[in-house]
Structure formats: structure tokens, C-alpha cells
């Protein structure tokens, strides 16, 4: 039973985070538990846990006695996220270059190739596969820093990447 709840909680977390990143849940909108309960097929307690987790990552704002809201977007926030992402990626890249092996390099080349092919399609006007592009872009950026040997750095990068992606999806640029 505990495992099932973890699966439901993880699934709910992924769905809501996806909907925030891809704009189905609009910045500033109130997340009314009773309304989203059926949409995400989750209990109120699972939703509270999920929304608190997303609040700790900065995707949701939890206001005492008022509820949960999708975090607003701003130019200032975007600039800060972009600067932090560059800082982390450059640091992780240095570490990866220093410790990466042939497998790391091969995975990096393969990830770049997949992303490059997808971006050629998108430049040609085919934007039907933005989910696939998102996955390939993530795989490439992760491959670049994967050999940094720091789980904490990779975890922080993942959160910043998703925050940055949210801004990209609002205007859909790549």
C-alpha cells in the first residue's frame, strides 16, 4: 500500500509540474484542491503533499490560510534563473571534462545529435513535437554535466532547468 501511495504521489507530482511548466496551469492561478482532485485523480492529502513539494521547488506558492497558487513569472525571475543555470552548468561542465571518460563523451555526442536533428525539424516549422524536443534538450544538458560527480549539483540543476523551461514554454522558443 505504501508503494502505491508513493506511485500516486510521484505521478501526481509529475503531472502537476508538467502542467505548470507547459502552461496548462496559468501563472498566478489558484489551485483549489476540490477542483483539481478529480483532474489529477488524487486525494486531498496527496495534493497537499505534492503542492508543498512544488512550493519547496518554487513552482507553487503556498500562502497560509489562503491556499496554493501557481508561482507568477517575471523578467527578474527569468534573469536570475538563467544566471544561476549558467553558473551551475559551467561549474558542472568543468568537473565533467575533468572526470568524464569515453562513455561520457559518447553519450554527449549522441545526445547532441538527437537534439540537433529535432531542432532542424523545428526550425523548418514543425513544432508538433515540443515534448520530444524538451526531452532531447534535457538529455543533452544532462549529458554535458553528468560526469561532474555531484548528486546535489545535478539535483539543483534539474530544478533550475525546469524553471527555465517553464519560461521557454510560455513563449515557446528553443
PLM feature spans:
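Conserved amphipathic alpha-helical segments that form helical-bundle/coiled-coil interaction surfaces
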Residues: 102-170
Amino acid at each position: 500500500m505504501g508503494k502505491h501511495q508513493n506511485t500516486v504521489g510521484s505521478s501526481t507530482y509529475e503531472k502537476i509540474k508538467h502542467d505548470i511548466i507547459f502552461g496548462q496551469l496559468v501563472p498566478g492561478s489558484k489551485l483549489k484542491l476540490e477542483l483539481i482532485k478529480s483532474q489529477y485523480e488524487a486525494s486531498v492529502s496527496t495534493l497537499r503533499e505534492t503542492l508543498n513539494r512544488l512550493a519547496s521547488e518554487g513552482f507553487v506558492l503556498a500562502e497560509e490560510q489562503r491556499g496554493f497558487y501557481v508561482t507568477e513569472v517575471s523578467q527578474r525571475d527569468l534573469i536570475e534563473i538563467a544566471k544561476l543555470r549558467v553558473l551551475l552548468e559551467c561549474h558542472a561542465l568543468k568537473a565533467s571534462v575533468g572526470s568524464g571518460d569515453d562513455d561520457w563523451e559518447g553519450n554527449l555526442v549522441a545526445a547532441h545529435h538527437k537534439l540537433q536533428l529535432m531542432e532542424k525539424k523545428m526550425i523548418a516549422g514543425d513544432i508538433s513535437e515540443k515534448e520530444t524536443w524538451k526531452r532531447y534538450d534535457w538529455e543533452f544538458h544532462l549529458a554535458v554535466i553528468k560526469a561532474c560527480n555531484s548528486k546535489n549539483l545535478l539535483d539543483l540543476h534539474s530544478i533550475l532547468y525546469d524553471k527555465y523551461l517553464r519560461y521557454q514554454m510560455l513563449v515557446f522558443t528553443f
